[in-house]
Amino acid sequence: MNIFKKIVMLPVGLALGLVGCSSGSSKTYVLTTTSFGYDPSYRPYIVRVNGEEVGGGFGAATKRSAIITGPQYITWGQTNIRKQHVAKNVPHLTKEDLKGKSYLAVHLYPDDRVEITLTEGRNMPDATKMGLEVRSKLIDELNESDKK
């Protein structure tokens, strides 16, 4: 029985070990992060990417955060009613996406979709054109409803 274990179990154990090594582990990058919330009816708070808190304040506040490659699960809170939001989509980041990047911005849209943008060097991320247009439209709608 002891010889059987050595003959059969050794190759099986080695094969399973190699499968684990080749499955493509995640790599962690430390980037300066921020977030932009485009819904004018509330301010997002405690924005998290894979459980790691990122900066906020519509790009004004930054934080150094550990970002891993692979799927990016994003959540955030809503200040006025203490609602917890979960992103409807799941962006994916690769090593190539993150290589040489300094900043990561999470963009939170009113329909709970998210977008991630990355910048190099000392170039701070900006709000997206789409986000600013959506925000402007919602502000106009809020102003119209206040007039009634």
Region locations from a protein language model:
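Bacterial N-terminal signal peptides that target proteins for export
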Residues: M1-M9
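C-terminal motif of bacterial Sec signal peptides marking the signal peptidase cleavage site
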Residues: G17-G20
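Beta-strand-rich cores of mature extracytoplasmic or soluble domains
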Residues: R82-K148
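Short coil/turn motif common to extracellular beta-sandwich-like domains
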Residues: S26-T33
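Bacterial signal peptide processing site
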Residues: S22-G24
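Tryptophan-paired
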Residues: Y42-K83
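Structural motif
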Residues: T33-S41
